[in-house]
Structure formats: C-alpha cells, structure tokens
Amino acid sequence: TIPMLNGRTICLRNIDIKKIFELIDKYNVTHFGGAPIVLNMITGAPESDRKKLKHKVYVLTAGAPPPSIIFKKMKSLGFEVMHVYGLTETYGHVTQCAWNDSWDELEEEKQNEIKARQGVRYPNTEGVTIMNPESMKEVPKDGKTIGEIMIRGNVVMKGYFKDKDATDKAMRGGWFHTGDLAVMHPDGYVKIQDRSKDIIISGGENISSIEIENTLAKHPSVSIAAVVAKQDEKWGEVPCAFIEAVKDKPVTGK
C-alpha cells in the first residue's frame, strides 16, 4: 500500500531476469519480493543478463525455506535479503528474520544460517509458537526439539469455506495448525525443518529434507536441489535427492 501511494510498484507477468535488472536500473528500484526459486534464477543467470546495481536493493523472500547459500550469492550481486514467513490462511507474512546487530561479528556462513530462519512474529500477530500437536504444549527453545508452528491472532482466517471438518482440524486447541515442522532457538527465532507430510522417517529417525537440500545447495556445482522420501526395504524410507547442476560446472559421480 505504501509504495502504491507514495512511489511506484512494478508488477511482472513473467520471471525475466534480464528485465528485472533493467527495471531496477531504470526506475531505481529499492525493494522487491521473490520466492527463493526466483533468487536462484537471479544468481544463476548469465552475466549478459545482469546489470551492476547502482545501489543496494532490499529483498523479501518467502514461499519456501531458502537455502543459506542464497544469501551469500545475492549479497555478492548487491542485494540484501530478508526471509519472511506466512500462509494464505494468515493473510500473508506473520514472521520476519529481523537482524540483530550483535550478529555482525559472526562469520559469514553463520550469519547466512541465521538469515535462513523464519524469525520472530510481527507485532500485529498475537502469537507464533512451536507446539507438540498432540499435547498442545510448547516444545523447549533449544533449537533441536521439533514441533508444529502454531499461529493465533486476528490475521488468521476464520475457516475454510464450507468445510467445517477441515476448519476444526486446523483450529483445534485455539491455534491455527500450519503443518510446518520447526524448532525454536533460545532467542525465540523459529526455523522450519520440514512440512509434516514431507518429513523422512528412516529407521525410526526423523530426517529433514530441507536440511539435506540446504547442504547440497552449498556445493558449487549444484544450482538447486530437492529431496524426497524413497521407500526402502530395510530402513522404511531413505532420502532421495534430485539435483539441477550449474551450467559449465564440472560434476563427478561422487
């Protein structure tokens, strides 16, 4: 609303990396939003499609948990990325990974790992917490114990249209159940581990597909990675990765 009233909002019908850089340059764009896949397309675009930025451009990214390496790649091009989190059912973003100045002293890799967190709630949201969905009790803030992200406040929908069963299931216990599995760090920052339907259970252990994807994305020859569960006779499920390699980068069997 603010840029529409006091500045300029540019909407793109298609993802065209060359056009994005041209518009940023032409209209002195200061902020833009895009899902992690769009940021990956920007960092992976040929140099001929990119323009050197005349000023820092601030980016909000949402729609999927971003791999930590994307923050480093975007920064090298002149972009400063902040991760935000929300759902259609919450009328948009309810958390942001607000930066603490004390983190400036950390090594770059650690900074990027923090930037990949979903963060803390916005002031207009009554509550964002991590609970055991069965007991409806908050999990320890240890950065390890996995629970489900629960949200409460007047930004949460009233329910699903003409679907009382789905509404009752999503709103049980007075909180909106997101279906996103996460941990909460001691500082209150939320970090998604997986969607509840995507978690890989191998030999009785929960394995986060997002964590594996994040690790794979750090390899210089990997453009993007997706990890899913594969049925296994011994372990029940094992991780299976699909990789899109960076063009002109060497890839070996290992």
Give each language-model segment a name.
Residues 55, 124, 221-224:
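Glycine-centered tight turns that cap/initiate beta-strands
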Residues 1-30, 45:
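Conserved AMP-binding/adenylation subdomain of ANL enzymes
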Residues 63, 86, 119, 180, ...:
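Active-site glycine-centered loops adjacent to acidic/histidine catalytic or metal-binding residues
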Residues 112-122, 140, 170-174:
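Short Gly/Pro-enriched turn/cap motifs at secondary-structure boundaries
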Residues 58-80, 90-93, 97-98, 123-124:
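Short gly/Ser/Thr-rich phosphate-binding loop of adenylate-forming enzymes
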Residues 121, 127-150, 186-187, 249-253:
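Conserved beta-loop-beta connector loops within the AMP-binding
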Residues 24, 32, 153, 158-159, ...:
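AMP-binding/adenylate-forming catalytic core of the ANL superfamily
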Residues 47, 87-116, 124-127, 131-135, ...:
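Active-site loops of AMP-binding adenylate-forming
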